[in-house]
Curated annotation (Swiss-Prot):
Keywords: Membrane, Transmembrane, Transmembrane helix. It is found in: Membrane. Disulfide bonds: none annotated. This is Transmembrane protein 267. InterPro entries: TMEM267. It is a multi-pass membrane protein. It comes from the Eukaryota. The chain crosses the membrane at residues 77-97, 114-134, 178-198.
Amino acid sequence: MASETEKTHALLQSCSTESLLSSLGLGLFCTVADRLLQFPIIQQNAWLRALSDNSVHCVIGMWSWAIVIGIRKKTDFGEIILAGFLASVIDIDHFLLSGSLSLKAALSLPRRPFLHCSTVIPTVVLTLKFTMHFFKLKDSWCFLPWMLFISWTSHHIRDGIRHGLWMCPFGKTSPLPFWLYVIITSSLPHICSFVMYFTGTRQMMSSKHGIHIDV
């Protein structure tokens, strides 16, 4: 576990100018990107709409993880790209549920696919964490559950502005206000960063991989 000094340092770092500017940039990107996706030229083309929407999920996932770890060396880009992949790959469940590679079928489902159930996120994250602990991978890959949590949660929050959050088996919420989506997305990297410090994950990342955290 992190010491009190490390916890205090985490709090100060998370309020740094660089970190706050990055979060403001992320919030601005969310606002502009989702407004641009409403343009008729995008909305009238199913493939363009789907690819654009998925690309925004990908960028938000990458940006969020970049805020968490900072970009200090070339290997950091690998993690950032992985975060973007995790944020966008969720939508593959549309095709799995439809049982077809047809985009029309994937967009005309009778219900929401299983990876869009928000209670799946803590289930998968905790399962991954326990699996890594069992196979003694918790040091080398300690960042992975957090990356998965941030990437998938950002995807669900963004989808929530249209459909609400599906909290199976408890039902779903009303659609999230756009302003709440922007605030949660911008704040999520900082919230995770705090908890990672409190649990010692950040110190483990630094000692094992030489990652210099600047959030």
